[in-house]
Curated annotation (Swiss-Prot):
It holds the Pfam family YozE_SAM_like. Signal peptide: none annotated. The lineage of its organism: Bacteria, Bacillati, Bacillota, Bacilli, Lactobacillales. SUPFAM superfamilies: YozE-like. This is UPF0346 protein LCA_0996. Belongs to the UPF0346 family.
Length: 74
């Protein structure tokens, strides 16, 4: 069964890691409205563009989503 993007992203959390994807994961954890059961790129991207003030660049989301897709193919 395919896991949601959020579930994958939570595997990247690390409060001591200052890499952009880890920081994105740390901040998304505290976002009560994050679409936790979603895996669709367009819907996630739209949500983050409107609500992801903690995300300094959408390129970070793109990188995290690419890693998510790779993990789903493994």
């Amino acid at each position: 069964m395919k896991q949601s993007f959020y579930r994958y992203l939570m595997t990247q959390r690390d409060p001591n890691n200052y890499e952009p994807v880890a920081q994105f994961a740390n901040n998304a954890f505290f976002d009560q409205s994050f679409p936790k059961h979603e895996g669709d790129y367009e819907l996630l991207s739209q949500y983050l563009e409107l609500n992801g003030s903690y995300l300094p660049s959408m390129l970070i989301f793109d990188e995290a989503y690419q890693l998510y897709q790779e993990s789903e193919q493994a």
